Structure formats: structure tokens, C-alpha cells
Amino acid sequence: MPSPYMDRPGAAVRLMVPDEDISFTDRIKGPQTVNLARHCGDFIVRRGDGAWSYQLAVVVDDALMGVTEVMRGDDLLLSAAQQIYLYRLLGFDPPEFAHVPLVCNEQGIRLSKRDRSLSMEYLRENHTPEEVLGIAAHRAGLIPSPFPISLSALLQLKV
């Protein structure tokens, strides 16, 4: 039931979630079960500024684009349960998920675009594609040291 406060300026819209388990098998992390109410709680689907939330936008966008596999950082593992709930609520089949370890620098701080941690320009000028893949695979814990590796060899790794 819509809240009488939904039309107030600056009001965010939350989706009330049931006390329900969402189970899925992550390609990297294996079987997962998340209780929406306990682990996530109700979550915003429309922000106070009127923009749609990331959770809703990514589900609708991926569903309409026919995305069947999603790979992202393991810091977003819990949000997979929210998204699976949204997929089902909207009548879409959820994709398969693979959550990989975050890529961190030597101090253990996550590399991010927001912090301008590393630029593609720098990588192109200073490394071969195989070196970049090797560095990324090593930082993600996929190979023991940052040696150059081809994309085909990387895809053959058993994670």
C-alpha cells in the first residue's frame, strides 16, 4: 500500500521486504542464503531527489538488456539477494552471479575509479594487456604472483 508521505518533496521510497530467505549459488562464493529482513532490511527504490535507486535501475536495465551473468566485487554479495528479489517481483528471471575479491593496493585499500586509483591511460602506456591481466588476476587472488597471462589462459583457471 502506498504511503501518504510518498508525494512529499525529498521523500525516498522504500520497498518493504518479507522475512524470507533468498537462496542462490554464486559462481565464486558457492551457495548463499540471505534473509532479506534480517540481513538487508527494507531498501530504497527511489531516492529523495527523485532518481531511481541503483538496485532497481540495475535490475530493470539488466533484465531488459537480456543480461544472464553478472560479475562484480564481493562487497556487493548481499545486494545480489535484494536484486534477485526485485527480479522475481518484476517477473524477470535473475541472472547468475559471480562475486570476485576486491582489487586492493599494497596497503589493502580498494582500488576505485572514484579515487582515481589507476587510469587506463597509464596502464596502456606502461603495460601489455597480458601484464595488466596478470596484475589484476594476482590482486584478485586468482594467481600466486603478478605474471603476464593471456585472456584465454585466465579463463581456463579453476577458481
How would you label these PLM feature ranges?
Residues 1-112, 119-123, 144:
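Active-site cores that bind ATP or allylic diphosphates and position pyrophosphate for catalysis
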Residues 107-159:
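Conserved catalytic-core subdomain
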